[in-house]
Regions:
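Active-site nucleophile and cofactor-binding loops and adjacent substrate-binding regions
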Residues: 15-23, 83-86, 110-116, 133
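Glycine-rich phosphate-binding loops at beta-strand->alpha-helix junctions
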Residues: 87, 100-128
Length: 133
């Protein structure tokens, strides 16, 4: 993950992730496969969630154990899928970018990459920052 802060058309700062946040889109695809879902079905499941699981904000390496625990606890695939999307977004915002308030992102937010190629990732970000991207 990378974050470029632009002010008056000039790059003000660049923040780069630690290794734990790279490949989040690929991680979602891997977990979808582990749950026997295609990525489109994973996204559909996430969007149908009634009560997303709280899987924390740890890096994706540790999230696998949280997913297995949620399965043992009887969480639905929908709630696990939505929980994963939310966890990845929260990890990116609060651990990688180290923001304290979503307002710190500024008025205009542009995203790219595998995590945001699906509506579930975008919805998780919208919900976390309190406005549509």
């Amino acid at each position: 993950m990378k974050c470029l802060e632009v002010e008056h058309g000039l790059i003000r700062s660049v923040k780069l992730n630690e290794a734990c946040s790279s490949g989040c889109g690929a991680f979602l695809l891997t977990v979808a496969k582990q749950l026997s879902l295609t990525l489109p079905l994973f996204v559909e499941a996430s969007l149908a969630s009634k009560e997303p699981c709280d899987l924390g904000t740890r890096c994706t390496v540790f999230m696998n154990s949280k997913v297995r625990q949620a399965q043992r606890d009887g969480a639905s695939l929908e709630d696990i899928a939505a929980g994963l999307c939310r966890s990845i977004v929260r990890n990116a915002l609060y651990k990688v970018l180290r923001i304290h308030d979503p307002a710190e992102l500024g008025e205009h937010v542009v995203v790219q990459g595998g995590t945001f190629l699906n509506d579930a990732g975008l919805r998780a970000l919208d919900e976390q920052i309190g406005r549509p991207i």
